[in-house]
Swiss-Prot record:
This is Indole diterpene prenyltransferase atmD. It comes from Aspergillus flavus. Belongs to the tryptophan dimethylallyltransferase family. The lineage of its organism: Eukaryota, Fungi, Dikarya, Ascomycota, Pezizomycotina. Substrate binds at R103, K190, R261, K263, Y265, Y346, Y413. L-tryptophan binds at A81, Y82, E90.
Length: 435
């Protein structure tokens, strides 16, 4: 009697076979992000049961909110500035000492985004958040509802705001971004807000709207205001104004824990290292031992992953790119009753998107200096994720750095997408196409 042949499949394939897809858009998004997330989770030694748990979460709660898949004829239905080519999602790998964590971030999008049914992409963000809140036991609405009230556009103002819309503005003005940390204990959700549309409505500068939305609610944010004041003082300084450094986003942990983080993001279009370092230290306002060590390590990492010669002037900007969000970002973690913001720099390695080898080499040199991070072969990690038959299938978008007694580095990845003919997205028996 012959033994039946086993038909084994990977976790992301098993989920697809068991549940199918609502439409071809979801099928194609899963073909891109399903195997990528599975590889990341396996590389980070997540138990198989936890891999299924997190893949199932992405499948049910994020996949339906990635929007229409790009077509050959029309590209993206809602093209954001979230990545250089408009892809609305990315994955990331965080190295916190020897601990490694997988993450996924995306702009919530639907077929109605940009239409009269959802002109600012707000309704889909609310729908997504309701879905997440119904699943995550520690989700809290307090901060989210506050920022919806202060940042979202009320329906009566829609026509006025659209009439004032500048060219290319929709790509820049992402009303909401959703971040998810895939942790051992579950999923941590981090909504992101900006005030660009609200600035169009009110005529108030968007960075002022961001700071005011926090400062004006002492009931929710009183414990965070001393740290916020340090950031505001820097933004009002002559140096920050000279470098055109301004507030651009805010984010937070949507959890009920008492030490939930509030994050404020600054953006600078001028990419000379000295300007980034100035923001990292908030013009010298931050000078504790972590900052002093962090500055030294930041410079090494910046020069390594951007493949800059050691004598490249710190006062010279990097080459311009066609990325609408070109420049750098720094976010500052604010914790309750802690007057010291904790900075994290986003290094814009996407300017070297044709030179992934230098980025990989620069990261490995950094990891080799910090053996406690336990990254012996970063090239193998990157090639496992993004090398198919010797052809790269993704790029590094950002590398982030902070220092908290040890280096804290995150690699953000954008997979390549292949647009399909529109006819391939026509409705049919989609569930039968779930392999």
């Amino acid at each position: 009697m012959s033994t039946p042949k086993s038909d084994t499949c990977s976790p992301h394939q098993a989920l697809a076979r068991g549940m199918g897809f609502k439409n071809h858009h979801e099928r194609l998004w899963w073909a891109t992000f399903g195997p990528l997330l599975e590889k990341l989770l396996a590389l980070c030694n997540y138990p198989v049961s936890l891999q299924y748990q997190h893949l199932s979460f992405i499948y049910h709660h994020l996949l339906p909110y990635l929007g229409p898949y790009p077509t050959v004829e029309n590209g993206f239905a809602w093209k954001t500035a979230y990545s250089p080519d408009g892809t609305p999602a990315e994955v990331s790998l965080n190295f916190d000492g020897p601990k490694k964590t997988v993450r996924m971030d995306h702009v919530p999008i639907s077929q109605w985004s940009g239409t009269p049914k959802d002109p600012f992409c707000q309704n889909v963000a609310l729908e997504l958040t309701k879905s997440l809140a119904g699943t995550l036991p520690d989700f809290t609405w307090d901060w989210f509802n506050h920022f919806v009230q202060t940042m979202f556009i009320p329906e009566p103002a829609t026509d006025v705001v659209l009439a004032r819309e500048p060219p290319n503005f929709r790509r820049m003005a992402m009303q909401s971004v959703n971040g998810c940390d895939l942790l051992t204990a579950g999923v941590r959700v981090k909504p992101v807000f900006n005030a660009l549309w609200k600035s169009i409505e009110t005529g108030i500068p968007h960075d002022k709207l961001l700071f005011d939305s926090i400062r004006n609610n002492t009931e929710l944010f009183g414990a965070y205001l001393p740290a916020l004041q340090v950031i505001e003082d820097y933004c009002q300084s002559d140096r920050a104004k000279e470098f055109q450094t301004r507030g651009c986003f805010l984010s937070f942990d949507a959890t009920s824990i008492k030490d939930a983080r509030l994050k404020v993001y600054l953006h600078g279009p001028q990419t000379a290292y000295m300007k980034v370092e100035d923001a990292f230290t908030l013009g010298g306002r931050l000078s504790n031992p972590n900052i002093q060590t962090g500055v030294k390590e930041l410079r090494k990492l910046w020069y390594a992953v951007l493949n800059l010669p050691s004598d490249f002037p710190e006062s010279e900007d990097l080459p311009a790119t066609d990325d609408l969000y070109q420049g750098w970002l720094v976010n500052y973690e604010l914790r309750p009753n802690n007057p010291v913001p904790e900075p994290k720099v986003y290094i814009p390695v996407a300017i070297n998107n044709k030179d992934q080898d230098s980025i990989v080499q620069g990261l490995q040199e950094f990891f080799d200096r910090h053996e406690s991070m336990d990254v012996r072969d970063y090239r193998d990690i990157f090639e496992t994720l993004f090398l198919d038959a010797k052809n790269p299938t993704g790029i590094h978008h950002f590398i982030t750095f902070s220092y908290k007694a040890h280096p804290y580095v995150t690699c953000y990845y954008k997979p390549h997408l292949e647009p399909v003919p529109a006819k391939e997205l026509e409705e049919s028996d989609v569930k039968g196409l779930s392999k």
